[in-house]
């Protein structure tokens, strides 16, 4: 038993080290790649000062943080709702952020600055989160809370569709592209959004013990002494914050929160002490690579990153499911 535990620990360490190395390599690729390839040796030149430090670096940092946030949100939701199909958009939080953003564009008539739009997106996500907490205070079961989140997401999606369909505002029509996900408008002015993500990401990565208990099921978690109502509310708020900030920076991006935790579990990383940092690293890698593809796939335009993540990720996910079923 001791030998097996040591082997498992070494295996987990190897996984985390490998993912950390891949994050570094993906970051280097993201900083170099673009319409003009800029090798690391040219980063201190005048061209590198503009393209790498002013354009690509803030974008790369945003992609890293959003990828980690979405993957961690998926891992938390899958443990919280005991459902491997749970993901950040499932509770309607992503759509709530979109409704907040669209309301800001309509009420501000396109005159609000970017930071104000970001705050409205976060506010929309947190409003949906507070509504979910209202349901949670009624001590609903996890399955009922999940259904409530799905219903809220449908309502928010309908509101966004109606607003965009009847709008003549060019800014609002541009939001349709934004809601597909993209980092094209990210620069150092969005650094406050990046900073807002970091403490929550670190805190979530340290919550392996309650999440391990929650993954055992509600009954087992109660028997182990976990204050279920408190932790469920706290984790829903943290997830709402991460998703709201992510949507404010990059729009709605699917696949990452659903598939990354599932892939790591299929690879044997089931303990949240390893799964949480693993999800943060793997989510950052996946979104960085998808962002590079989105930038380079077309010569004259940039693909929505949400389209890239779904196109690249769905076949891999199906292959892993078929492999695990054999």
Swiss-Prot record:
Key words, A-Z: Cell inner membrane, Cell membrane, Membrane, Transmembrane, Transmembrane helix, Transport
A GO term, aspect molecular function: vitamin transmembrane transporter activity
Domain of life (superkingdom): Bacteria
Membrane topology: Multi-pass membrane protein
GO CC annotations on file: plasma membrane
Pfam families: FecCD
Compartments where located: Cell inner membrane
Record keyword Signal present: no
SUPFAM superfamilies (UniProt xref): ABC transporter involved in vitamin B12 uptake, BtuC
Gene3D superfamilies for the chain: ABC transporter involved in vitamin B12 uptake, BtuC
Transmembrane segments annotated in the record for this chain: 15-35, 61-81, 88-108, 112-132, 146-166, 184-204, 240-260, 274-294, 302-322
Stored InterPro entries: ABC_BtuC-like (IPR037294), ABC_transptr_BtuC (IPR023691), ABC_transptr_permease_BtuC (IPR000522)
BP terms from Gene Ontology: cobalamin transport
NCBIfam families per the UniProt record, alphabetical: PRK03784.1
Role: Part of the ABC transporter complex BtuCDF involved in vitamin B12 import. Involved in the translocation of the substrate across the membrane.
Protein family (similarity comment): Belongs to the binding-protein-dependent transport system permease family. FecCD subfamily.
Assembly and binders: The complex is composed of two ATP-binding proteins (BtuD), two transmembrane proteins (BtuC) and a solute-binding protein (BtuF).
HAMAP family recorded: BtuC
Protein name: Vitamin B12 import system permease protein BtuC
Source organism: Salmonella newport (strain SL254)
